[in-house]
Amino acid sequence: LNCGRNALAYLIKSKKIRKIYMPKFMCDSCDKVLNDNGVEVIYYNIGLDFRPVLSSWDGYLYIVNFYGQLSNQYIESLGCNIIVDNAQSYFQEPINGIDTLYTCRKFFGVPDGAILYTDSRIEIDVIDQSYSRMNFLLGRYERTASEFYKDYVDNNHLFKHEPIKRMSKLTDNLLHGIDYEFVKKRRTENFAYLHKQFEEENQLKLICPAGAFMYPLYLMNGVDIRKNYKNIRFLFLLYGLQYSKYVMKMN
């Protein structure tokens, strides 16, 4: 498909979902899809282990596998009527019989793309075309990333209004040219290195996932540390910033 939120839209339409439980610790990328399809949304908390803090649900449970910290064994133990969002765990295998979605743009330099594993079907005839959205990807090979940041943001915003489409032929072709084993190995090594450096200070008890998305670092004085670095060209990832308002609710 063309994007992760439309993978959810696909499931809503094909399974006729009318009620869904979503984590509070999440960006608003799916809000429009849920509103447009008239889905009742119940929000739930997660713990510091990123597991849902609820004992039952009477609709579908949307599980976000934050930072790849949820094992397939745990996911299977949750039972039926669940949807797994592996947008942050691209290299984790889907579980037979459980609807699972992946997004490609979080891991690879492609302008669109999502993968959905499901046993439900609806006809999707329109194929996305992404050739006109390659500028910010190609430009970074010869210029600085900051020069193309606006194009990157505009591309992300575009999908908020895009209907369900199939993945573009261009993205499909690019994905077939990736050395996935190399990417998985390098990402795993990077996560392990960071965890070795920060394990004692990190308030999170982490597992090292294969092909990690990013390293989540939760420090007791994290807000002060951020202030100290705000005038330095230091990398603060957007995901950490947009979720920060929920951190205190996780305790």
Predicted segments, located by residue:
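Conserved PLP cofactor-binding pocket of PLP-dependent enzymes
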Residues: 207-218, 222-251
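Active-site regions of enzymes building and remodeling cell-envelope glycoconjugates
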Residues: 37-42, 58-61, 77-83, 96-103, ...
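Conserved glycine-rich beta-strand-loop-beta hairpin in the small C-terminal domain of fold type I
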Residues: 166-195, 204-218
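PLP-dependent aminotransferase-like
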Residues: 2, 6-81, 86-90
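Active-site C-terminal subdomain of aminotransferase-like
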Residues: 121-170
